[in-house]
């Protein structure tokens, strides 16, 4: 902080306000004055994580001369005997649910007061250890330079050239986004608060939290398996620790700061684990991983899963968003089957391969869409293919979710009438009109994030444009992918067509701009699209380089005329993971028709 006048300066510490700032967010806050340059404390909140305690330590570069604070809470159940002290001024402890504190300094003109903040999930001692270990000095420029170097080391893992500067900005903004979560969740000594609320030590791995798995299994974690496999393996180990500490003995659904918040559906940890395993990123306990996946997928209490196990579908009259749940469970079950097959567990492979076919049970051939079923086995009569809320779906409608069988696209195509009929159906998704009433009450979605009835801001659609490839219409994949890249991403404050969802929207952009995408994580295949870059160079952790080159690249030349891999013509529109991590060169020959 720089103060422009020769006067008394004030720094306010606000422990009562937050991002959403709703009442009763704070359970308790506490502040302790250690000396005239060091304060410690914690803030315990409920909400997204219903029991979250952040411990902190703050040091000032200049001593404060006095301080004070106030608890603005209207009610306090029990005040104790603290009332005998004047706690508003120069009292070394402050506590309450609505606490603000101030610190006064004597400054001269243009004086700077620097602050360093350390946080911990374990203790104020841990916060102070983190602070002193990570920034032991007061050299601001050094911190800035070191921070820039760290970011550059991440950003340069993929180096690209583009036609337009804004495409370059979009790409590296996307890489930046993919580095923001999951987040490191342990102190420098390895300690962290676990899901059981006890203190654990991360030995030989970095512990992570903030797992928005319903979103990030699709592209973020597959991206990590290419450019950050060690980090992704540590994330999987963190998920396995979550499983062991969980009262329910489940892998994370949407976990944050030693809490499971149960947001969204599916059990997509299994997708992240299977994708890593199938791609050779196995620096974790594979036997524990398979155990955790199987046990999670057998939890009958979870989101209609008992009905799904018994009936082969989730009944809408027993558990809402039933079609979405059925389809996502089927995909997750396929992921478990792939792991079991690789580990020679034939019994588990057969069980979950059979379960992975359950998507068929909610397809109504009479209307050509996935449709909610009731517990008596009949389809629900009230049915609107465009409706989302209370209609059997979550963050999507029947149009979107009827295309969600990522693990068996050819079977889906045959079920929906064959390749020509499917291609026509899929094309109409992008050309039809979705009336405003169908998304008026949907958070984070506006007309700007929609192309026809394709809603890019909702993740269930992220693989959809690539399905044209499986219907022998790769040109339609190429046309639509390039259109989405250009329309749904802008270098501005409103530049995304929806919530970035912990890096998933950005990971989609990175893959698609490079020219390929993981339609079914848990497979070793990527589906080819239409690259946006002129060239790209992926620096792989194994020391090799995978290069991408486009010939005749332009705004109009969105169609792929030919592809070569290491000088040989690529047959079809599938790229293998081994092709990438072995290093080499992928060349796209582009054209306007």
Question: Which residue stretches match the model-derived regions?
Answer:
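Beta-sandwich/jelly-roll carbohydrate-recognition scaffolds of carbohydrate-active enzymes
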Residues: 2-208, 241, 498
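A conserved hydrophobic secondary-structure block that centers on an alpha-helix together
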Residues: 6-10, 20, 161, 206-210, ...
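Beta-rich accessory regions
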Residues: 7-8, 12, 34-35, 109-112, ...
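Secretory-pathway/luminal and periplasmic proteins that interact with or process carbohydrate-rich
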Residues: 20-23, 180-186, 244-250, 301-302, ...
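Carboxylate/His-rich catalytic cores and anion/metal-binding grooves
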Residues: 161-188, 226-239, 261-295, 360
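Aromatic/His-enriched, Gly/Pro-containing loop or helix-boundary segments
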Residues: 201-208, 249-267
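Active-site core of glycosidic bond-cleaving carbohydrate-active enzymes
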Residues: 203-228, 266, 270, 280-532, ...
């Amino acid at each position: 902080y720089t103060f422009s006048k020769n006067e008394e300066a004030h720094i306010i510490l606000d422990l009562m306000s937050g991002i959403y700032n709703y009442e009763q967010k704070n359970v308790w806050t506490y502040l302790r004055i250690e000396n005239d340059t060091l304060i410690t404390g914690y803030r315990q909140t409920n909400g997204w994580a219903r029991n979250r305690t952040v411990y902190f330590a703050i040091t000032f570069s200049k001593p404060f001369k006095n301080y004070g604070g106030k608890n603005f809470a209207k009610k306090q159940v029990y005040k104790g005997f603290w009332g005998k002290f004047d706690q508003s001024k120069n009292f070394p402890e402050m506590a309450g649910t609505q606490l603000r504190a101030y610190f006064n300094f004597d400054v001269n003109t243009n004086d700077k007061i620097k602050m360093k903040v350390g946080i911990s999930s374990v203790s104020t001692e841990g916060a102070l250890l983190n602070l002193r270990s990570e920034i032991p000095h007061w050299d601001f420029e050094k911190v800035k330079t070191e921070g820039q170097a760290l970011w550059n080391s991440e950003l340069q893992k993929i180096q690209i050239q583009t036609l337009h500067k804004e495409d370059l900005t979009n790409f590296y903004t996307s890489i930046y986004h993919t580095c923001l979560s999951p987040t490191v969740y342990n102190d420098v000594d390895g300690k962290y608060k676990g899901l059981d609320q006890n203190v654990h030590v991360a030995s030989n791995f970095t512990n992570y939290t903030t797992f928005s798995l319903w979103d990030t299994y699709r592209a973020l974690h597959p991206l990590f398996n290419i450019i950050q496999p060690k980090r992704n393996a540590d994330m999987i180990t963190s998920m396995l620790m979550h499983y062991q500490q969980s009262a329910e003995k489940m892998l994370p659904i949407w976990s944050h700061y030693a809490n499971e918040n149960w947001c969204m559906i599916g059990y997509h940890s299994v997708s992240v684990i299977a994708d890593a395993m199938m791609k050779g990123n196995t620096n974790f306990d594979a036997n524990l991983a398979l155990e955790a996946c199987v046990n999670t997928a057998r939890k009958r209490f979870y989101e209609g899963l008992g009905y799904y196990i018994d009936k082969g579908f989730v009944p809408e009259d027993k558990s809402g968003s039933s079609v979405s749940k059925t389809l996502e469970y089927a995909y997750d079950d396929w992921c478990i089957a792939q792991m079991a097959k690789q580990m020679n567990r034939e019994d588990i492979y057969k069980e979950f391969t059979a379960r992975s076919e359950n998507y068929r049970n909610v397809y109504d051939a009479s209307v050509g869409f996935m449709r909610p079923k009731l517990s008596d086995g009949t389809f629900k009569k009230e049915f609107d293919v465009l409706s989302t809320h209370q209609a059997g779906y979550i963050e999507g409608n029947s149009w979107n979710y009827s295309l969600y069988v990522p693990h068996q696209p050819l079977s889906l195509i045959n079920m929906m009438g064959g390749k020509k009929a499917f291609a026509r159906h899929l094309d109409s998704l992008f050309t039809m009109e979705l009336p405003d009433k169908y998304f008026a009450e949907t958070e984070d979605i506006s007309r700007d994030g929609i192309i026809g009835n394709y809603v890019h801001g909702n993740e269930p659609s992220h693989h959809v444009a690539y399905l044209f490839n499986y219907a022998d219409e790769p040109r339609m994949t190429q046309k639509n992918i390039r259109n989405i890249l250009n329309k749904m991403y802008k270098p501005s404050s409103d530049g995304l067509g929806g919530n970035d969802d912990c890096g998933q929207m950005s990971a989609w952009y990175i893959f698609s701009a490079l020219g390929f995408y993981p339609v079914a994580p848990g497979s070793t295949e990527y589906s080819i699209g239409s690259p946006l870059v002129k060239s790209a160079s992926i620096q792989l952790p194994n020391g090799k380089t995978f290069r991408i080159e486009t010939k005749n690249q332009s705004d109009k030349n969105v169609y792929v005329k030919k592809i070569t891999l290491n000088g040989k013509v690529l047959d079809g529109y599938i790229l293998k993971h081994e092709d990438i991590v072995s290093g080499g060169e992928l060349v796209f020959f582009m054209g306007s028709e």
